[in-house]
Amino acid sequence: MKAFMDKDFLLETETAKKLFHDYAEKTPILDYHCHINPKEIAEDRQFDNITQVWLGGDHYKWRFMRSCGVDEKYITGDASDYEKFCKWAECLGKAIGNPLFHWSHLDKNTADEVWNLCNEKLQQPSMSVRNLIKQSNVTLICTTDDPIDSLEWHKKLAADDTFDVKVLPAWRPDKAMNIEKPDYLDYLEKLAAAAGMT
C-alpha cells in the first residue's frame, strides 16, 4: 500500500520526480509570505504544545474551523490547547483535498497519539523556532506586517549576528481596507501617528 505522504508526494510523473529530486529539493526556501511572529523568531520561542505551533495564529485554520461550525471558544477562545487541538482534528475529515488536510493528516481517532508524540518532540531544543527554520533550509522570511507595526523585532533580528536567516517585513494593510469596521477611524489615527502625520 502506498504511503499517504512519501518522498514523491504530488510528483506524479518521472519527469516531476527527476526535476524535484535532482534540482529543486535542496534549493533554499525564500518564504515571502509567512505568518510566523517575528517576536517568536527573535526570542527563539520553544513551544509548549502542537496547538501553539499549528493553531496559535493561523487564521486559515480558524476560518476552516468556523466553516465547520466549531464554537469560537475552541478557536480563539478560552478552551484549553488540548481541546482546541481535538476540535481541529475533528474538522479535518471535511478537508480532504485541501492543503490543510495534507499538512495535518490526522483525525479524532489519532488526535491523542499525535498530540502526545508532537508535544514530546517539541520539548527538544532542536525544535525551537529558530532551529525549525534552519532545519527547513529557509534563508529568507517575509513576515506579514501592518503599516502601523513598529518593526521592533525585525530591527532586533537584523542586529543579531547569531541568526543568519534574513527576516524582513512585508506589506499587509488589511486593516486599512476594512472601512466597514467600527474601529476603522481609530485605525486611521494610529496609521497617521505611525506615519508622523499627527
Question: Model-predicted segments: where are they?
Answer:
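Metal-cofactor-binding active-site regions of metalloenzymes
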Residues: 2-29, 34-198
